[in-house]
Amino acid sequence: NNPVNYIDPDGMDWYEANNKEIIWTNYTSQKDLDDNKIEGKYLGQAHVVFSGSRDERLGKKNGKNGYIDGEGAITANVTLYGPRGADDITTMTGFTMTSNVNKYGAITEGLFNANYDVNGKSGILKSNWVLNHRKEIPTMDNKPNQSPYAGENYGKPIKTGIFIHSTNSSGYAGGTVSTGCLLLAPQDFQTFNKIMSGVRNFTVRLTKEQTIIVPFPLAVFIGHEPFIRLTTIRR
C-alpha cells in the first residue's frame, strides 16, 4: 500500500447521524459538524463497521475446525465505507472474537480511531491497519488480559497492537491467527487493502450481539419457560 496514492481530494468524509445512519458529507471535522448545527459523530475519510456477536465461532472444513468459511461458522458482517464517495460501500466477512476467546479474550465493543501504520504488523499475516496507533484498547467486559501473549498487559483489562488483518489464505483462523486482532476473510482483506489505499486515518465501530438469559418468575403460572432470552446489541 502507498499511503499517498489517494488523499481525499474532494474534502468529503463520513459521519454518523443520531439515528446511527452513516452519511457522506462535505464536512471534514467534528468542529465543522458542530459549527453547522449538524448533529452526529464525525467518522473520518473512511469508516469500518464490524457487526459481530459474542456467540461467534469458527467452522469446520475438510474435517478440521477453525475456519472462517467452515461449516457451522458464525461470523461478523463487516461494512467498509470507503474514501471515494457515498457509493463506496463494500460488505465483507469478518471475525471479532479471536482464535480462542477463552484463552486469549477479545476487545470491547465501541468506536475506535484507527490509522495506517507505516511499519506494519510483524509475522506472516501482514497488515498496516491498526486501532489507536497500537495503543491500549479495553478488553471485553474489562476482563483481565490472561493471554499467554499479553506481555506487560498481563492481568490488565487492556490489549495493545490491535490490527485488522486476514485469516490464513485457506480461511483458517484458529491457533494463534488472532490473539486480539480483528479478522477479515482472505479475499476480503485484499479488497480492503485496495479500497483503503491512500487512507491514513479512519474509524472502526465494533458491535456485538449478546443474548442474556434472565429468570422469569411468573413462568410457572402461565406455562412459560422459567427464563427469558433477551438480545441486545452492544456498541
Tell me what each language-model feature is.
Residues 161-195:
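Active-site scaffold segments
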Residues 8-11, 105, 110, 180:
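Glycine-centered flexibility sites
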Residues 1-14:
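Surface-exposed coil/loop segments, especially low-complexity Tyr/Gly/Ser/Thr-rich stretches
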Residues 213-216, 233-235:
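Short, solvent-exposed mixed-charge patches
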Residues 15-16, 183:
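Well-ordered beta-strand positions
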Residues 15, 231-232:
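Serine/threonine-rich low-complexity intrinsically disordered regions
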Residues 16-175, 200-202, 206-210, 216-217, ...:
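Cell wall/extracellular polymer interaction/catalysis modules
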Residues 9-12, 193-198:
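Composition- and surface-driven signal marking solvent-exposed, interaction-prone regions
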